[in-house]
Amino acid sequence: MSEVLGIIGEYNPFHNGHLYHIAKSKEESGAEFVICIISGNFVQRGDTSIVNKWAKAKMALANGADLVIELPTVYSISSAENFAQGAIKILNSLKIVDTISFGMETDDVAILNNIANVLYNEPKEYTTMLAHELKKGNSFPKARENALMMYLNDIKKYVNVLSGSNNILGIEYLKALKKTKSHMIPMGVKRQKVLYNDEYMVDEFASATSIRRMLKTREFDDIRRAMPKSSYQILGQELKQGHYVIDLSCFEKEIIYTLRKMSQEEIANLPDVSEGLDTSLKNAANSCNTLKELINIVKSKRFTQTRIQRILLYALLGIDKKQMDISKKINPYIRVLGFNAKGKQLISEMLRINPKLPVITSVKKYMDSLPNKNLKEMLNRDIFAGNVYTLGYEMDSWANLDYTNKIITM
């Protein structure tokens, strides 16, 4: 088979930067086929996806992807490390992907690889520095950044690298490739003109963060400029039908209710909860009226807002530490969201190489076949996440769309 490219993204929503990334990656790798792994209805920074996973799959297929696979929820709302490992495990399991491409703020993959080597090998000097930084009360990301800067001993070279959201994910992809002894070749594509959190446009480029802000203020002319025509049309259809969820605040009553209902022991059993955070969350839930108020009370130098939001999603979606631990030990299933003619070829080739590969094209058939217990529970979390997600719609808050929605074909 010709060269196959793997890309991991959230596409929340799919914009011109994503289009550039796919086109540039194909050009530089010489790939004929593109497989995209995308997060589903909830995303890595502990928030909702603006539109559902099928709409995002349509956007990707209309703009260069041949096969779109869902990253299971347990990975997609987790830390950068778990997010990357889940996606890399999926791509590895396909046994047909030659190159993995990711966006980055720097223009030098070697710099990211230097950092990934330290994180993978964990030399004693580095871990001692990390422990020291954590004792100062820093959040884990900040403590890790400080420890890496000291260990690598080249502030000028690395200071801006560790502040880039795409760089951080890129480092985790590289680390996951090493951890899984992957044969896939990594390549990076530098972001164009705007960074991940920039809230302004430059020419036809805007970050997904900026587009989501513009959606709240209904700046549709700028949104149209920042997205491929097909993506904008798909977004418009979803908005017109009331099938969108602006952000996590759409579920604030459900989240506060869930935390009030949970015992403190159950809260303590949520991933990322440690060091008395269970007490803070329980007390805040019992006294707060809004999600914003709850987050502002609980977040601190030690516990970032993103970490708090992830924990709130774990509570809302019923994901505990045991499920998270299992996800780190097993290979996920291959949940197909959509494909075109070339994508159909890819699926055939995957199954030719490994007929037992857990490829899901029908959720009902897969659940009825009594598969691996751990994979079944993981898929149940995806289904439940979808059932919760539609509660945020303005209209048609139907459950079980994972059973009724068809695979997107183009």
Feature locations, PLM:
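Class I S-adenosyl-L-methionine
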Residues: 23-26, 57-61, 175, 212
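A glycine-rich helix N-cap at a beta->alpha junction
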Residues: 58-72
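Active-site cores that bind ATP or allylic diphosphates and position pyrophosphate for catalysis
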Residues: 71-410
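Non-catalytic positions within long, well-ordered alpha-helices that form the structural scaffold/packing
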Residues: 26-27, 61, 88, 92-93
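N-terminal catalytic cores of NTP/NDP-binding nucleotidyl/phosphoryl-transfer enzymes
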Residues: 1-56
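Short, high-confidence coil segments that cap the C-terminus of an alpha-helix
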Residues: 29-31, 65, 96-97
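A structural micro-motif
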Residues: 32, 66, 182-184
